[in-house]
Amino acid sequence: MKINLGGRISFVFLKFTMNKVYLFLFLIHFSSFANNCNNSVKEIYQNIITSIGNNSLYPPELHFSDETRSVAYMSSKGITIEQKTIDLFCGKGNFEDKIAYIIAHELAHYYLEHSWMSNTGLSYASSIGEFVEDSSSLYSVKQKKLSESQADLYAGFYGQIAGYNTLGFGEEALTEVYESYSLPKELNGYPSFDERIDILNSRRNKANDLALLFELGNVFLKNKNYNSAKYCFEFILKNKFNSREIYNNLGLSYLL
């Protein structure tokens, strides 16, 4: 029996070459897919910044990181979100809503100037990722819970008027983050995971109500029902939410 080794070697070589080609094409596709998600994150970030419209603080810059320990955090450079976090949600359902929650929550701490998040110098530890176990009396657990409540309400409202259901998918996003990063559910001096979920859910209805009031105010303004529009925008401002659009629309309600 005569075996054609040359033909067999050629076949194996061809198969090996094709596998390399498939792998190369897969990597190109994956890289393109990841870039699309990163571009979406940039767009989401800008949309939320625009919805906040706060000129009292210079908008922080967005940065991506290849580290895999902090999820998202504030620093003197701005807001950083890890690529691992983006990849966690990339290509899955409600990607924009989940990423919007992460981003809006960090932006909330930035604009609300929650200095308890300060770690060392001008660096910060994220309320979602790299935790600070601070037992100092200056910022008690009660104060941290209040700050988290404020941040979720803030993130819910501004995320909603930017077009994202941030608090509707906040619990799902947090759960996936905790599991992916193997974060402990209990931390000394900080709200537990269950408390974070309770805080998030407790603020959902109020954030949605305020966002609905904002949309109603716009409808009233468009239909020349100026007194009702004034009530909507003033009620939102009395709840300590402001943006250029809210003030502009309130001003139009008085002028028209």
Q: How would you name each of these model-derived features?
A:
Residues 21-30:
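Sec-dependent N-terminal signal peptides
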